[in-house]
Amino acid sequence: MWIADGWKDYEVIDCSDGEKLERWGKYILLRPDPQVLWSTPKKNPNWNKLNGHYHRSNKGGGEWEFFNLPKQWTINYRDLTFNLKPFSFKHTGLFPEQAANWDWFSKIIKESGRKDVKVLNLFAYTGGATCAVAKAGAAVTHVDASKGMVTWAKENAVSSGLADAPIRWIVDDCVKFVEREIRRGNKYDAIIMDPPSYGRGPKGEIWKIEEKIHPFIQLCSKLLSDTPLFFLVNSYTTGLAPAVLTYMISTEVKARYGGHVVSDEIGLPVSDTGLVLPCGAAGRWQE
């Protein structure tokens, strides 16, 4: 398992009864987590010192309850700064476990010694990976179907000192954007994708990951340059086991470029227990 253990401003303090107790900077949040199937004693005093609690609804969704929590605040990861704003579907605007991937590809970019690395970040959300890529010295194209998410990602770039970095911001359906890039003959040295389990594009395009992910990996592999550095696929869908990611990336990327594919779970350390909370999986190819 790849563990995002480099955080200072974030931690999973404890988890029990379908919820995880987290510290985001100086604020304590309690959010539902479908992986937390256990019921363990809640001994940490922070269980009773919440600044925000997302309550699930029996009808689906839910709502936030706030206790002296600002509408927006920031946390840092290494030399990156992220703007947090709790919003619908329990989210804060950041997936801290992805830091395990940021560290991995940042090292690859820096060690390549290349000054002209071009990276494509698809389903790019609020730009955690985009900022990490840019900070590592590469040019990045950030694509997300949500205008609001792209605006938020720009704010994160500015906060991280990347206002003048070579970042191209695109609001578009990711599949259609990739198809157009293929027609234009554009190439990238690395591709990152973080597809949702289910989603809709700006014109109502429906995305179901089990149906779409393999053809999409196939499509994206056509955008790789002659000397690609890495290819990363993230998954939060329990049906997409690491071995499934390895198989798909191997048939489409490794078959063409050689290199190595490794897939595994991604997790966050739990401070009170010393155990690890699983947070999905990732498949990684590198030359």
Regions found by a protein language model. Name each.
Residues 139-144:
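Conserved SAM-binding motif I beta-strand of class I
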Residues 96-114:
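Conserved alpha-helix/loop element of class I SAM-dependent methyltransferases that forms part
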Residues 126-138:
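Conserved SAM-binding loop of SAM-dependent methyltransferases across substrates and taxa
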Residues 6-22, 29-96, 103:
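Non-catalytic substrate-recognition/targeting regions of SAM-dependent transferases
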Residues 211-227:
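A short glycine-rich, Lys/Arg-flanked "PGG" loop and its adjoining helix->strand segment in the class I
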Residues 115-125:
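Conserved class I S-adenosyl-L-methionine
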Residues 146-192:
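S-adenosyl-L-methionine
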Residues 228-287:
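C-terminal catalytic and target-recognition region of SAM-dependent MTase-like enzymes
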